[in-house]
UniProtKB/Swiss-Prot annotation:
Induction or repression: Cell cycle-regulated with a peak of transcription at the G1/S boundary.
Bias type Polar residues, positions: 26-42
InterPro entries: Clp1/Grc3, CLP1_P, P-loop_NTPase
Residues annotated as binding ATP: 246-253
GO biological process assignments: cleavage in ITS2 between 5.8S rRNA and LSU-rRNA of tricistronic rRNA transcript (SSU-rRNA, 5.8S rRNA, LSU-rRNA); rRNA processing; termination of RNA polymerase I transcription
Origin: domain of life: Eukaryota
Recorded family membership: Belongs to the Clp1 family. NOL9/GRC3 subfamily.
Protein name: Polynucleotide 5'-hydroxyl-kinase GRC3
Example of a GO MF term: ATP binding
Described function: Polynucleotide 5'-kinase involved in rRNA processing. Required for the efficient termination by RNA polymerase I and the processing of the IST2 pre-rRNA internal transcribed spacer localized between the 5.8S and 25S rRNAs. May act by maintaining the phosphorylated status of the downstream RNT1 cleavage product, which in turn allows the torpedo activity of RAT1 to efficiently terminate Pol I transcription. In vitro, displays polynucleotide kinase activity on both single- and double-stranded RNA and on single-stranded DNA alone, but not double-stranded DNA alone.
Compartment(s) of residence: Nucleus, Nucleolus
Signal peptide start and end residues: none
EC number: 2.7.1.-
Amino acid sequence: MVIDSKQDLPQYTKDSGSESDSDSSNNFIVESPSIPSSKSATVVLNSEEYEDDEGDDLNGLDAELIDNITYEGDEDETMFVGLKEKQKLHLSGVFRLQVVKGGIVYNNVHYNASREILTFWHPLSQSIPTIDFSHFAGWQDTFFMPRNNRFKIRDEEFKSFPCVLRVFNSNHTGLLEAGHLYRDVNYLWKPKEPYFPLNERTTYHLLHESDRIQSLSVPGYWSTPLEKLYLSHKNAAYDTRIMVIGGKNSGKSTFLRLLLEKFTQDIRDSTTSQEELVYLDLDPGQPEYSLPDSISLNKILSSPISLGQHLCQGSNFQTLLQFYAGSSSPQDEPTSYLNCADKLIDHLEEQAFFGTSLLNLPGWIKGFGMQILNHIIRKYKPTHLLFLETANSKRHLDELTIPQSFSTSLRDAYAPEVVRVPAHSLNHTLSSRFHASQLRTFKILALFHKITQFDYDFAPLLKSAPLQISYGKGKSGIKGIQFPMEFQDLNPQDIKSALEGTVIGIYTYSGEDSLEVKSLNTFPILQSCTSSSKNFITLGLIHSIDTSQQIMNIYVPPCHTQILDKQPEDAQWIIVRNKTETPFCDFLPSPRTITWDDNIQIPFATFERRKKLEHVWKVRKNVMRRGQFMKR
């Protein structure tokens, strides 16, 4: 969607304290491009060609975009968009973008025209950030047109546009096909009935006001704390520790994402390589970088440039340490959760880290959740503590206990800077479209169907063969099975059914002492095992168990098989059964997603509909109703 903005960029929503966006962020008008302002800066335009290994009709685009868009329709579904002053663009999906001429502003960060390729992730479960027009920030504007595109497009076509963008398909193949297996996310990346229909191969979509999308509007009262935190990151002599606290749907993840995008762009522009950025992802229910139901410590990479909400599918981070929490909320096993969080923070301390770290927490701020927050504050020792307040959460946040000063191995006593900012719910109109449980299922499916870093195959797992792993005494495979505390007294006859069709955590044991296990119906049940002696590897999905041969059939994410292969041959394997939800669409796929061999006879099952007058006769028990008495 190309629209004309009524305000100069960057644009903020002036919110009066409510959690809704202003009208200007929800009402989009698609208009023909206006004539550039006479006050626009005069720039000298150089033309620079370069080779591009990525691979003029409009294909039915609306007439109101003809002057702005040139659609090539090549193998990458390339589209060139020209923007004039005060115009902006809305796109959904996963796509790559190059600023060919001028510049753009995205989430209040400026990006100049260059050869750099930006990868954008815009799911419709989130508010869609706008790609705003901007001029080239420099002395001499340059036209970075790939040579293979220059043969098809004349310079005169975009001469009147101060900003030109090249939008083309993502290099992630198969990701948008998750809806074929899990229908709830069929329209996660694209509108159900797009106003501007493009080729089916496109991984992005132009958005229109009729698509009922919500624009990401950054409120004005967020701009000041964002700018202050950026200056603290840029000018800090020691490490900077930023912690954001708030209730559910208060905008914690969005606020941290805005900070990250600003910090990473600053690191790319910096002449030194000493600045580092790490992210403590402690929200197992809605993680930004962790595996499903896990918490982790991650190093953020400045390249490749990944913008937006990637739903844990991005490649701009490196996981330093990760623990499987086993559920979407810390309230299920708070002690285990805190132990894992402490180990992540201890690992950060051991690195003598001088850069900037950010910490994301779940929105549990009531009852025992407040004790968890107080514990992590004392452990993490933030330099900056930001509260995102609402009318309901303000009284809970007043119960926080914040020490007056902290001290670490890198610096002596320092006082944390505490800032209270009104929360801003950015996705309130979209809450009925995608629920958190649906997004969690999508992330689990994406994990088990991820072939390589960029390739996905959402064919049902039943069409592929699982790994066969032995278990039990005298076997070289799984040495121990761990259940949650409330299932320690599980009936031995129920262990098999409690494991089949469930998601498990796969660990290796590194303790010096031998594992303390108890054999129950051939299953080696762990009696005690400290978390410090377990190394989390990945998640698995148990297909079935053969108790006679003591073999488990387990699906492992294809992208993680190399991690398993790197483990030593004498590694002692442990699996942990917890409360992660199973994606049943993999085990019970719809008939249209899987075809059976005609030679396979499945008893008592049919995928054919009965004829109109065909009925199934069922024998009913005589319950001695009045009409069922036999006459004599």
